[in-house]
Amino acid sequence: MQNFGKVAVLMGGFSSEREISLDSGTAILNALKSKGIDAYAFDPKETPLSELKAQGFQTAFNILHGTYGEDGAVQGALELLGIPYTGSGVAASAIGMDKYRCKLIWQALGLPVPEFAVLHDDTDFDAVEEKLGLPMFVKPAAEGSSVGVVKVKGKGRLKSVYEELKHLQGEIIAERFIGGGEYSCPVLNGKGLPGIHIIPATEFYDYEAKYNRNDTIYQCPSEDLTEAEESLMRELAVRGAQAIGAESCVRVDFLKDTDGKLYLLEINTLPGMTSHSLVPKSAAVTGVGFADLCIEILKTAHVG
């Protein structure tokens, strides 16, 4: 096996997704140790990143979610320290964390995305409701794990929802509702893995459904995707990742409308690795267990 030296599993951090990161990090740490890797937990909230060099770490497995963890900040710090790290680089991480600018790039390249609008204090909210229709989704551009996602159903409600959310990270986006199914497709080392059909018990795949409930259904392989649709989803996931320069292991989320058209929703450049997480479920279908998946991701560690 490749010699990775002393490995820091970067977990925890400062964002609203801290607890999820700790869960993922603990699972990864245990998996790496089970494979004989000299791995240790490292929480930047408790210990400055500058200590990585002082403590003799040679590789970083980054599973920091949210602000500072997957927005290019920690990636830049690791570049300066010269420590190879997993996940995407600085630019791709920053773009992937910004749903608005990621959508602009996908749209410019002809990839299918739901119609959307950016909201500001002086937005004509009635016009946005008329353009996108109801219901619609409203979300902050730079939060993950469905933090702050609201389904707006009632006419005249858009402005008040915007006021509730505008303190969150990044622009606030209104997005056309796509009334079909929810899916996700991981990409590992530039190769699309089996798509997952997500059937939440809640109204949509929100934070509660992702992390706190056991009745969300994950179908992998999906029972309602044709072979052609599955192939297209993988192709679109790979193209979506390549469009922003994302690498290592990412996950692209999709919606499928009632006519069967697929839409790219967003990309996660550092997908979760908890017991509820989607990437391990997809990899398992291909015969890759959790510990082996962690090793495959660790092999992608890079600088530059």
Curated annotation (Swiss-Prot):
Binding of Mg(2+) 1, residues: 253, 266
GO cellular-component term (any): cytoplasm
Gene: ddl
Subcellular location: Cytoplasm
Binding-site positions, Mg(2+) 2: 266, 268
Keyword tags: ATP-binding, Cell shape, Cell wall biogenesis/degradation, Cytoplasm, Ligase, Magnesium, Manganese, Metal-binding, Nucleotide-binding, Peptidoglycan synthesis
UniProt name for this protein: D-alanine--D-alanine ligase
Organism: Neisseria meningitidis serogroup C / serotype 2a (strain ATCC 700532 / DSM 15464 / FAM18)
Enzyme Commission no: 6.3.2.4
